[in-house]
Structure formats: structure tokens, C-alpha cells
Amino acid sequence: MLTRGFTSIGKIASRGLSSTFYQDAFQLSDQLTEDERSLMLSAREYCQERLLPRVTEAYRTEKFDPSLIPEMGSMGLLGAPYQGYGCAGTSTVGYGLIAREVERVDSGYRSTMSVQTSLVIGPIYNYGSEDQKQKYIPDLASGKKIGCFGLTEPNHGSNPGGMETKATWDETTKTYKLNGSKTWISNSPVSDVMVVWARSARHNNKIKGFILERGMKGLTTPKIEGKLSLRASITGQIAMDDVPVPEENLLPNAEGLQGPFGCLNNARLGIAWGALGAAEECFHLARQYTLDRQQFGRPLAQNQLMQLKMADMLTEISLGLQGCLRVSRLKDEGKVQSEQISIIKRNSCGKALEVARKARDMLGGNGIVDEYHIMRHMVNLETVNTYEGTHDVHALILGRAITGLNGFC
């Protein structure tokens, strides 16, 4: 079994290598507050002790463990960047550090956590009424209830403006009747609470957010089977056939695509940090493997080609983390722009996937065995590079900001 890279300082010293420069090239830890460092270490301890031992079996069997949610809730990892209602109230950087540690173990686990935080608690916190916040957020933050976010549709992925799901007001029952379907929805088959976006005729066909609950008539959430990525998390659909939603479940402070896009921007920040956590793990695993592996009478790591790959990996990871830190600080200062988030989401996910592919190559045949973890990270990152805005969609967002011209056509 391959030793985890960041716990192998003793092995490094035994080889006469006193430097741990590769572990934190730009001294990120020194740029954190004491609370942020403490949070990072607590999250790392939980993830390594509780998540890592079960991830391989979860990936092999494509079986989601719902006990993860209350576990994460008890650690304060759910709803972390929000104040009150049972949430920890961390900085945006603190939330990013949590995502980094969870995804260091598995992108699927981080997806589960970040959906609950940014895409379920987030819209209720930012767009909900006080009654909605009091009713839903404490149970979501504790993990007593699981949530999901319904935006993507079978015919509308990168084009949410084409949304077909409809909300029709029924004056007789004083409810909205929701009809339509959402797909590729993380957590949906096990969710108790669903934040769903639909076009509302009562609001001039504008997009509005609704809180749905398990057990509502006409609501089903079938699981999507056969995934080759994010197998430790659960993904499904939301099917709605005249689902009656009471008026008090309408999110009052969200209108148009700015509602779901605001949620996605918060999620993308966590994804940017998380993807680099997976990249770091691949880098450390490949580094340790090539130090331990003897070929041609010397460590594989002594070959120039291996050192070039590791230099490239360390450079991209270190620069990426600095970008994540800066954009997160800007968000905490109320200065962040959505295009800045697009830069780090696009960069982190694209570079993390490149790092994982290089690391897989460095392990040769062993790179495809789940015992060594890298192949799992690699296929997970294929999805992470796709959701919450694909690599190319974020290029179009940035291109529009650069030129003032809309390339979405």
C-alpha cells in the first residue's frame, strides 16, 4: 500500500532530504489565520481517519453511505461559511480549506458536502424568508436532513436559460404545481429537501426557486446507475408531475438566473479549492511511489523525466492555491467578481486533471489499481472539470469579460 505523501516526513529525512519545501511551496499555512489553520487540521484529521478508510470500497461498489452527512454535520463542515442557524460561520477561506481536505480523499465526498452547503443551505440562507431559514437550515447544517439542488435538465446543461420546468399557480389549492425534470443531481435519491428552479407563470415566466420536500405528491428521485466517476457519492434525477408546492416554499428573494448563478459561484469557490486537494494527493502519492520504486538500480524519482513531471505538478498546485486564497479573501471583503471565480474554477479543475493524469502515468501499471488511489482521483476530476460550468464555458465567461462580446451562441 502506498504511503500518504503528507505523512511521510520521517521517510524523507531518512533519505537525507531535510527540506519539506514540496509540501507547501508558497507557505500557504503562514497566510492563514489561527482559526483557519485549526479548522484545516481538524478537517484533515477527520477526513484521513474517517473518510479515507472507506472510500475504496465505496468506489468499488458505487454505494453511498448516508451516515457521512450527520458525521460532517457534527464536525461543523456543513454550512460552514454561513452565520447562525447552527452553521459554523467560518471565512470563505475556511470553507475552501474544508473542501480541499475532503477532496484530498475523494471528489464525490466533497460533492456531497458542497452541494449541502453552497447549493441547499446557501440559497435558503441568501434568498429565503426568516421562517424558511429557521425551518430548514439547522437540520441541514447538522446533517439530520440531506439536500439537493435542481437546476440542470435533460435538454439544458450549459444553457440553463432554456429551462423547461414550469411552476403554475393554482388559485384553488393556493399552491404552485411544478412539472418537469432535473438530471445529474447530486444527493437527489436520498434528499429530504430539494431546492428546485422553475419558470413561474405567476412571475412573468421568470425563474424562481422553490423548496420541495420528500413525500410531496408527484415527486420522485430515481438514481442514475453505472457512473464511472464520483462513485462514492450518489447522483440522480428529480421528476415532478404536478407536484403541489405551498406558497411559503417559494424563495422570496431570488428572481431570474442570478438566483441559481449566485449559488453556483459559491459552490465554484469550494470546487476550486477541492480540485487542488485531489491534485495535491496525486502529487504526493506519485512522489512517494517514485522514491520507493527502484528501476535501473536507482529510485525512479532520480530520473529527469520524473523530476520534470513533479516540478510541473508542484508549480501548478502552488500557483493555483494562491489564486484560490486571493479570490476567497476578496469574497470575504465583499469585492469578488464572478469572473475571478471563473478563473480559479477553470484553472484548478483543468490543472488538477492534468496533474492526476501525469501521476497515473508515473505509477505505470500500478496507476490503474484502486489501491493506489490516483486513477480514482483522475476519473473523478473528469466530472469536476465538467460540472458547475465546464472548462470551455468558463472560457466563454472570461472571453466575454475580456472583449465585451458574447460568445454564447
Curated annotation (Swiss-Prot):
InterPro entries: Acyl-CoA_DH_CS, Acyl-CoA_Oxase/DH_mid-dom, Acyl-CoA_Oxase/DH_mid-dom_sf, AcylCo_DH-like_C, AcylCo_DH/oxidase_C, AcylCoA_DH/ox_N, AcylCoA_DH/ox_N_sf, AcylCoA_DH/oxidase_NM_dom_sf
Protein's recorded name: Probable glutaryl-CoA dehydrogenase, mitochondrial
Chain residues that bind FAD: 149-152, 158, 184-186, 390, 408
Top EC group: oxidoreductase
GO MF annotations, alphabetized: fatty-acyl-CoA binding; flavin adenine dinucleotide binding; glutaryl-CoA dehydrogenase activity
Family designation: Belongs to the acyl-CoA dehydrogenase family.
Pathway linked to the protein: Amino-acid metabolism; lysine degradation; Amino-acid metabolism; tryptophan metabolism
Disulfide bridge positions per record: none
Matches recorded under CDD domains: GCD
Subcellular location: Mitochondrion matrix
Organism: Caenorhabditis elegans
Essential cofactor(s): FAD
Biological process, per Gene Ontology: fatty acid beta-oxidation using acyl-CoA dehydrogenase; fatty-acyl-CoA biosynthetic process; L-tryptophan metabolic process
